[in-house]
Amino acid sequence: MKTIIAILYAHLVKRQNQKWIDNPIKWQTNTFKKLIKNGIKTEFGKNHDFENIKSYDQYKEKVPVRDYEELRPYIEKVVNGEKDILWPGKPLYFAKTSGTTSGAKYIPITKESIKTHIRSARDALLNYFLKTKNFKPLNGKHMFLQGSPELDKKQGIYHGRLSGISAHYVPKLFLRNRKPSWTTNCIEDWEEKVEAVIQETVGEKMTIIAGIPSWVQMYFEKIVLKEGKTISQVFPDLSLYVYGGVSYEPYRQIFDKLFGKSIDTLATFPASEGFFGYQDQFNKDYTDLLLLLNNDIFYEFIKAEDFLSGKYDRISIKDVELDVNYLLIISTSAGLWSYNIGDTIKFTSIDPYRIIVSGRIKHFLSAFGEHVISEEVEKAMEVATKLNNVAIREFTVAPKINPIDMLPHHEWYVEFENFPEDMSAFTKSLDNEMINQNIYYKDLIDGKILKSLEVISVERGGFNNYMKSVGRLGGQNKVPRLSNDRKIADKLKTINA
């Protein structure tokens, strides 16, 4: 019965979504007009003359691009209980995240925007079922490794992790078969929580597991160690792994080993600020994401190269080009206006609009003018691990600026699952692929400004130790792939000494 309902619902959703997929520019134009209309009587709208904005060009003249720190004065008013500041009324929630220079970020979630988060997660699964004809996951247990659903309250507004907020909106179709229990989900200590999740899930008919790869990996490894079996032996009905927030490629080899068999994966692009995309095709090795244009989000784009050099020229979706690295800018029904979320994307298709997430604008390495981005180091690692039959657990890249008796270079801190037989060959593979991808890096190597990169092995569990030491173990927290300073590198050296 559940399968029949899902099939009918999936076909209905497909027809609804096809309307905006077939008319993307029209939908974005209508979204723009709708957002401006709703924002006219807000404090932000009055300060930026929304009443007289009739076109996108006028909007760009009146509303600058802002990041969280620049929008903070408005958000603080909302946090303090004031209404009609960024969006009519007050938000339902604040998604609390870490990562700013002045403490936690509070991202508003309104009654309009929460619906788009939930609908997108639902649509991603329904699309998967319809495209693959695999409805078996519906007839089993589903595990979502996430933050605590216990929410704090401030000025009458609940706040917590986005994944914890979303736990209050699980569709009835999935609620009965959901794991872990509410009590276990509320455990704050991550390692204790994983142990409790294992107790609740081993022996159950698990068919869907979702979560950030690094933390699901920890969960899987503890099960394999405890049971002495592969994941597919422990969970023979498991047929779908859903992830978001990071590239799966660096984890693919180790997950294949843990699974012990091939398993379907579903890539998504959720964030506290909005749900931006999900994988809509399931050919081999295909993980491009359909950009969602029906979520009350108006998208703008700035070439990442321009942004890093101080030029903020932005365009709407009708002017984007393929294979250009863009910084993603959003205006939403949560009251974020031309907001820089920090993610960079590339378009792989414009009919329909599909993207890959190429990295974080703040997670780049350009200590020597090389402009290296996350996508490049992940691609280099993918190539090097395949060429050298290596599996890795985690890695990050940092600059070595003033070494003694040698040229500056990049240091790659790598936690290996299995070590290369020839470390110098592995290192050479990484360096060659970076040279192939990044012309600036090649010029610096050829010009003897930089020497070839160096690989530094991190002891087993080293990255988890690092994340624990900075209070970011578990949940939606991720290790940055690269940085322009040595904070992570030096900390890794200290705790792994």
Residue ranges and their predicted role:
Residues M1-E51, Y59-R66, P73-K77, G81, ...:
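Active-site glycine/GP-rich loop and adjacent strand/helix microenvironment
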Residues T31, G89-K90, S113-L125, E192-K193, ...:
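Short, glycine/acidic-rich beta->alpha junctions
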Residues F94-I107, V455:
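Conserved adenylation A10 loop of the ANL superfamily
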Residues A104, I114-K115, F419-P420:
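Short strand->helix junction
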Residues P108, E112-S120, Y241-V242, T265:
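Long, hydrophobic, well-ordered secondary-structure blocks that form the structural core
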Residues Y128-K172:
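Conserved AMP-binding loop of ANL adenylate-forming enzymes
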